[in-house]
Amino acid sequence: EIELEVMTCPKMVYVKQKDDFLTTDELDANDRVENISGTALRQALQHRHALPDWFSFPEIIQTLQTAYPPKHEQGFTLFFTGLSGSGKSTLAKAVQAKLSEANTRTVTLLDGDVIRKNLSAGLGFSKKDRDINVKRLGYVASEITKHRGIAICASIAPYVEARRFVRKQVEQYGGFIEIYVATPFDVCKSRDIKGLYQQAEEGVITGFTGVDDPYEAPEQPELVIDTSQMTIPEALEVIFHGLQQLGFYENNCATYVSQRHASKKQVQFVAENMTDII
């Protein structure tokens, strides 16, 4: 027996015409109660809408605004995935250059080949090793995102489950925008100056994605780009228009993609499926 008495705290509400907080038991029939739901609060913070003075102390509101910045101030990860030769790295470098012009957030390019050399040395190309490599890439991207930077990943990342793991890891801290570079196999093969596709087809090398190892196409990517159907500048317009639509990029001088460049076959927006990151 420790003789503790449980104390209850009555629910308090703000009554506008009385400019006071009352318990629900003290309300009159004609009292007008003001209320902000959790969803409304998140939306107000996300869009930098002013919160009413009665909601909280100014210092607390300022702390909330600092802790939950709008999307265009949050960190996010752009994750380019596709076959070898699809144009992932070229697009990633072009996006990095354009984002760096804004100079509002740190932009870091994480190229798959560089990650393999520096973080995944010793790993092979079995499914297990490839998944480990992609998850390491995702961890670095999540740390960049957590500190409100922009991570740009360019990796074949052939398996859905590993990419899903990375998405979940990153979305703890910010946005995750998966960009499927869906350039056709024959086009990718024609761009292969090293002849790796031919060697894989001849059996000289094994475990090559798209030949004797599967590439599992993304199920619901935020963007789909086919570099055989558009130039790099056109693809950039699609990507940055997508970032604006999703709320992660603000630039009043940005060129909006034309209807000709944004056919359904070239780009698919699934912003409605984005996880609420606040």
Residue spans for each PLM region:
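ATP-binding Walker
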Residues: 86
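Small-molecule kinase domains that catalyze NTP-dependent phosphoryl transfer to phosphate-bearing small molecules
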Residues: 15, 182-185, 190-238, 246-269, ...
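Hydrophobic anchor at the beta1->P-loop junction of P-loop NTPases
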Residues: 80
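Active-site cores that bind ATP or allylic diphosphates and position pyrophosphate for catalysis
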Residues: 1-74
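Conserved substrate/cofactor phosphate-moiety recognition/catalytic segment
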Residues: 93-142, 146
